[in-house]
């Protein structure tokens, strides 16, 4: 059975939820389903192998022309709440890509996070199914929704391993690295990503340097911290780079020191490149991988982080073990089969 599927996102930008939709569209179209991506705001960083259409929030898409309407994000979810017909043939699904109150608490004060988060959850009352990114997140959202309305689906990443950076970028990084062991981070620079912990750890890792690919509101604070700790000569901020996974071949260690994550797509990117990974021991990472595949550290414990980085440097088998886990549980085939099952049995 082939389906006609509409995806709704805020804008076509290089962010986790939009990348997930891109993977969904690629997989669905490879299996002969028809897809359309609707979006609200300008931006064309991410391209899709299907029709895309910019819409205004107040205009209604033809819900009953589709088998599935799949929204991603606050505005798309609220859009479905307001525009879904009372007699709707299409099944409406949302994928929730975060831990809503927890995530908003890093952006707003706790009161605002609580109010906005709960209003968002209330707006999902008209959706037929709510998909989370993990079993842990499914449990988290059971505070708002019945078990029957919830399910989970692990993400995937399907990226080229031969993608390269420019000669100037490579020369800059090699000149910075020299004979050091290079820790790499690809992330938006926010407090939630926990990159400050890596800068703190450099004090005790004299033979290591840190390369950060990404932009964000915490950049200035991170730069100030590197100067305060007198390690600024061992930290290189590369700024925002499209397809940041292209930098993975130059890293000796890939770090994910996050305080909170909905999933962690960069973990899968590192797996595809067979990289040794150090990550915080938050529930989502503990669910996705085990200590034979990555080196965990205790969040906010710099001594634990230093130990994990040293161990990951010595354990050459981590990257291969992580890649095997990716093939077993997070491959595009696994991703497609899971979502197909969700779509068919709502």
Which functions belong to the PLM regions below?
Residues 240, 259:
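Aromatic "clamp/platform" in nucleotide-sugar-dependent glycosyltransferases that forms part
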Residues 276-279:
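Short hydrophobic beta-strand element within catalytic cores of glycosyltransferases
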Residues 291-302, 310-316:
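Conserved acidic donor-binding segment of nucleotide-sugar-dependent glycosyltransferases
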Residues 125-149, 157-161:
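A short, active-site helix/loop in glycosyltransferases that binds the activated sugar's phosphate group
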Residues 18-23, 181-204, 217-223:
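A conserved mid-protein helix/loop that constitutes part of the nucleotide-sugar donor-binding site
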């Amino acid at each position: 059975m082939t389906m006609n599927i509409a995806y709704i996102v805020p804008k076509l930008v290089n962010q986790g939820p939009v990348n997930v939709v891109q993977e969904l569209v690629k997989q669905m179209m490879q299996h002969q389903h028809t897809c359309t991506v609707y979006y609200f705001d300008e931006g064309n960083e991410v391209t899709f192998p299907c029709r895309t259409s910019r819409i205004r929030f107040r205009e209604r898409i033809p819900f009953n022309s589709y088998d599935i309407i799949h929204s991603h994000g606050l505005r798309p979810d609220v859009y479905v709440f307001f525009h879904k017909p009372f007699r709707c043939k299409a099944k409406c699904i949302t994928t929730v890509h975060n831990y809503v109150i927890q995530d908003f608490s890093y952006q707003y004060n706790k009161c605002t996070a609580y109010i906005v988060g709960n209003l968002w959850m209330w707006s999902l009352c008209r959706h037929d199914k709510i998909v989370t990114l993990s079993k842990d997140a499914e449990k988290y959202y059971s505070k708002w929704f019945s078990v029957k309305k919830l399910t989970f689906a692990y993400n995937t990443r399907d990226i080229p391993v031969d993608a390269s950076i420019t000669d100037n970028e490579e020369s800059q990084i090699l000149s910075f690295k020299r004979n050091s062991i290079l820790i790499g981070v690809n992330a938006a620079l926010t407090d939630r990503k926990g990159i400050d912990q890596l800068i703190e750890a450099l004090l005790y890792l004299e033979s290591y340097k840190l390369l950060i690919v990404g932009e964000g509101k915490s950049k200035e604070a991170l730069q100030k911290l590197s100067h305060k700790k007198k390690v600024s000569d061992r930290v290189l901020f590369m700024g925002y780079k499209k397809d940041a996974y292209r930098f993975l071949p130059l890293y000796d260690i890939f770090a994910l020191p996050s305080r909170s994550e909905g999933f962690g797509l960069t973990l899968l990117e590192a797996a595809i490149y067979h990289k040794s990974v150090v990550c915080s021991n938050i529930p989502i990472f503990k669910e996705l991988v085990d200590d034979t595949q990555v080196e965990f550290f205790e969040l906010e414990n710099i001594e634990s982080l230093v130990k994990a980085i040293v161990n990951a440097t010595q354990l050459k088998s981590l990257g291969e073990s992580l890649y095997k886990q990716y093939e077993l549980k997070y491959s595009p085939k696994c991703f497609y089969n899971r979502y197909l099952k969700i779509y068919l049995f709502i």
